Amino acid sequence: MKYSTLAWLVIASYTVFAQDGTSVTGYTTTIVIPGSPPAGAGTAHGDTENTGTVHTTEHLTGTEETHTTGATPETTTIVAPTTTHENTTTHETSVENTATVHHNTTTLHHNTTTIHPNATGTETHTETGTGTLTGTGTEGPALTTTTVAEAFSLAAGASLGYLVALLFL
């Protein structure tokens, strides 16, 4: 059981490492600042600033040697939002008076009431009939003490078999 768990962990870790095999050498950052940018802060308009240091040494032999140190340069882009203000006002006034006359019509319906008298009465229903019930068949055996004894013996045998099986496990 422990071996199979270890095998699954190894397979899962190889799967994760296979998906994560990317390398990064440089990166670009875009910063969006609301409003106008302050004067003289950082680089503007996507210019690139190299933070490395360059040393130039000239030997007595006349050859020139150049050493460059520093990290991979970072490119920073600052995007300032542009705001446009436009005010447009249009006033149009139009007044038209329209009169509509509606005629009221009233319809009167006559009320009609119908009175039904309550009816009371008694009803008697009698059903009589004659017939014959016929059929053939056999009646099953009744539960006897022999059947109960066989069931008890079967249960005891199953219990004994269960106990013997537990001894060998």
UniProtKB/Swiss-Prot annotation:
Residues lipid-modified (GPI-anchor amidated glycine): G140
Propeptide residue interval(s): 141-169
Residues linked to a glycan: N87, N104, N111, N118
GO cellular component, one term: side of membrane
Compartment list: Cell membrane
The organism's place on the tree of life at top rank: Eukaryota
Leader sequence residues: 1-18
Protein name: Probable GPI-anchored adhesin-like protein PGA22
Purpose of the protein: Putative adhesin which may be involved in cell adhesion and virulence.
Induction: Up-regulated upon milbemycins A3 oxim derivative (A3Ox) treatment.
Membrane topology value: Lipid-anchor; GPI-anchor
Lineage, uppermost ranks: Eukaryota, Fungi, Dikarya, Ascomycota, Saccharomycotina
A biological process term (GO) from this entry: cell adhesion
Entry keywords, A to Z: Cell adhesion, Cell membrane, Glycoprotein, GPI-anchor, Lipoprotein, Membrane, Signal, Virulence
